[in-house]
Amino acid sequence: MKIGIVGCLGRMGRIIVQEVVGTGGVELSGGVVRRGNGLVGEDMGAVLGCGHGAKITDSKEFLFDCSDVVIDFSSPECMLECVGIASEKRVPLVSGTTGVDERDFRTHAEKVPLLWSCNMSLGVTLLLELVKMAAAGFRGYDVEIRELHHRAKKDAPSGTSLMLGKAVAQGMGVELESQQHTFGSGCRRSGAVGFSVARGGGVIGDHAVMFLGDDEIVELQHRAIDRRVFARGAIKAACWLVGKPAGLYTMSDVLRA
């Protein structure tokens, strides 16, 4: 199976390339970088020190033409372009790009299998299921979602925190917007869902969901200690997605397989 990488020289892209090279049954078809990058045309494996054979290109269309499935970790603008190309060429796409919305995928998912998740970790995927169960059982408890990331992370709350918030709301049987507590908005009403965000150091990702009752606190937590967990999840998702009917999938579908 040939896997193409969009954003192959980015922080996550480099790790995914290395993991694909070390995974049996799959091979790199190529990688996309921004137009004007001086490495266009170079051997991707040679540049990253992990094998040979796949070229770096600035043409997304070319990458999709030579791939069985494409993995995207880029920018929202680049991701939207990739979704359109995937739909046109009927090539499955796995995207871990944040700062976008499920609605950006819906129309194209009628033509091609797409999988999008703000977090490719199977551990976080399982945490989402546990949070739904806990929220259904702890109705009336206050909920606080805490996150800590490296100093360079731009979006806040993170995409993962928002997924956890939606999981809480689903467990409660409500819409997140109706239950969300905004810091500084006054006293907290019973059962509200709040978000606490911290940035600093080189923390990869630390998320916790606290269910706060009057006489007990229950906390569910996930801590990423190596970015490879996201790369391995993305590769697993890519292998799973090939051959699936058109539609929009999540890591929960992969976990249940």
UniProtKB/Swiss-Prot annotation:
- Annotated binding of (S)-2,3,4,5-tetrahydrodipicolinate, by residue: 150, 159-160
Residues bound to NADP(+) are 34
Which reactions does this protein catalyse?
A: (S)-2,3,4,5-tetrahydrodipicolinate + NAD(+) + H2O = (2S,4S)-4-hydroxy-2,3,4,5-tetrahydrodipicolinate + NADH + H(+); (S)-2,3,4,5-tetrahydrodipicolinate + NADP(+) + H2O = (2S,4S)-4-hydroxy-2,3,4,5-tetrahydrodipicolinate + NADPH + H(+)
Keyword annotations for this protein? Amino-acid biosynthesis, Cytoplasm, Diaminopimelate biosynthesis, Lysine biosynthesis, NAD, NADP, Oxidoreductase
Gene label? dapB
What GO cellular component term, any one, is given? cytoplasm
The protein's name is 4-hydroxy-tetrahydrodipicolinate reductase
Binding-site list for NAD(+): 7-12, 96-98, 117-120
